[in-house]
Amino acid sequence: MGMTMTQKILAAHAGLESVKAGQLIEVNLDLVLGNDITTPVAINEFKKFGVDKVFNKSQIAIVPDHFTPNKDIKAAEQVKYVREFSNKMGIENFFEVGEMGIEHCLLPEKGLVVAGDVVIGADSHTCTYGALGAFSTGIGSTDMAAGMATGQTWFKVPSAIKFILKNKPAKWVSGKDIILHIIGMIGVDGALYKSMEFVGDGLNYLSMDDRFTMANMAIEAGGKNGIFPVDDKTVEYLKEHTKKEWEVYKADEDAEYDEVIEIELNTLRPTVSFPHLPDNTRTIDNVGDIDIDQVVIGSCTNGRISDLRIARDILKGKKVKKGIRCIVIPGTQNIYLQALEEGIIKDLIEAGVVVSTPTCGPCLGGHMGILAKGERCVSTTNRNFVGRMGHVESEVYLASPAVAAASALTGKITDPELV
């Protein structure tokens, strides 16, 4: 029996001719990632190993992003601790505030991840890089520490679900709507410890930003990773952003999948995830009359330039409804700069939007837009658990940038076709 795309990458990095689902293997790592929340714990564990250097100074990336710029004294102390460790170890990819960005937007932009890589990150949405044809997955701080010390980690080889995406999606149906539809269909544990492998002619209509969004939310279906085949769009992106060499892995024709699911993209509608789980989805036609207090457009899921362009296209020349707070957060400094150069920021501010520096911020209830008791938010983020963005009695509705921007104009969850 052949191997899936994920299994081929893992086999190569384990120095094995083949692997099979359930097999325990030790693999060599191309990149180890941490942020301002998880890295301090990893450093504490690293110090217990009795080693005085990291395995490779250029293959570790540390991105303060959750509470950046420092939101309080504790956040400042955390980043200081991480900064001092990075300087002592000579870690080349520590991203200071001037280079700031949400880690999963920043690393592809910096060319640190390429097709065929194995990447671990002490952040659950590390699965984002599957959009580039890499195997990437979230791990805990202890595994991050071991990875920094040895350049290796262990995995149980995952089985896979193949998603065959067919046809062209409608105008307002984006990668966010597709992945919300999938999560709603299979559930938050529907791909538990499985590789979600996306194929089909529908990929021709999905931009790299769409793919980043979809791979990013694989974890919300329980997936070990989400991954896309390398095609012309992938290669174009890699050529633009990196000087590293990459390797393309393809699933075998006789690869075994636990399930094969076909999705007709042309039948999908904009989709909203209701509180308090990402799989509690409804199409925009079935959301009902729901008043909101806040809109957030950003995050590692939807903070890229195409997301900001969509928001601008809907909001330009109009006004955010009085009493509604609309917060836009570019994913990186470069995205922010590009949005400035394209006039997007000007158009958004004139529409009544507040624009933040790049940060995870409100997504995890950190800062820059926390919800009070009883408040509702339409957000382009990736999780809507109880208390995720603030008070435990607040509500988060996950949606695309188009739905979020349209909702900011009306004060209700709104179909972008109607504005």
From Swiss-Prot:
Coiled coil regions, renumbered to chain: none
Q: Please state what class of enzyme this protein is.
A: lyase
Q: Which reaction does it catalyse?
A: (2R,3S)-3-isopropylmalate = (2S)-2-isopropylmalate
| Cross-referenced Pfam families | Aconitase
- Cofactor binding summary note: Binds 1 [4Fe-4S] cluster per subunit.
- Might you give the EC number(s) for this enzyme? 4.2.1.33
The transmembrane residues are none
Q: GO BP, one example?
A: L-leucine biosynthetic process
Task: Please name the pathway.
Answer: Amino-acid biosynthesis; L-leucine biosynthesis; L-leucine from 3-methyl-2-oxobutanoate: step 2/4
Q: Where does [4Fe-4S] cluster bind?
A: 300, 360, 363
> Which GO MF terms does the UniProt record name?
3-isopropylmalate dehydratase activity; 4 iron, 4 sulfur cluster binding; metal ion binding
What keywords is this UniProt entry annotated with? 4Fe-4S, Amino-acid biosynthesis, Branched-chain amino acid biosynthesis, Iron, Iron-sulfur, Leucine biosynthesis, Lyase, Metal-binding
Necessary cofactors: [4Fe-4S] cluster
Instruction: Name the InterPro entries on file.
Output: Acnase/IPM_dHydase_lsu_aba_1/3 (IPR015931), Acoase/IPM_deHydtase_lsu_aba (IPR001030), Aconitase_4Fe-4S_BS (IPR018136), Aconitase_4Fe-4S_dom (IPR036008), HAcnase/IPMdehydase_lsu_prok (IPR011826), Homoacnase/IPMdehydase_lsu (IPR006251), IPM_dehydratase_rel_enz (IPR050067), IPMI_cat (IPR033941)
Q: How would you summarize the oligomeric state and partners of this protein?
A: Heterodimer of LeuC and LeuD.
As for family, the record states:
Belongs to the aconitase/IPM isomerase family. LeuC type 2 subfamily.
| Role played | Catalyzes the isomerization between 2-isopropylmalate and 3-isopropylmalate, via the formation of 2-isopropylmaleate.
Q: What protein is this chain from?
A: 3-isopropylmalate dehydratase large subunit
Source organism per entry reads Clostridium botulinum (strain Eklund 17B / Type B)
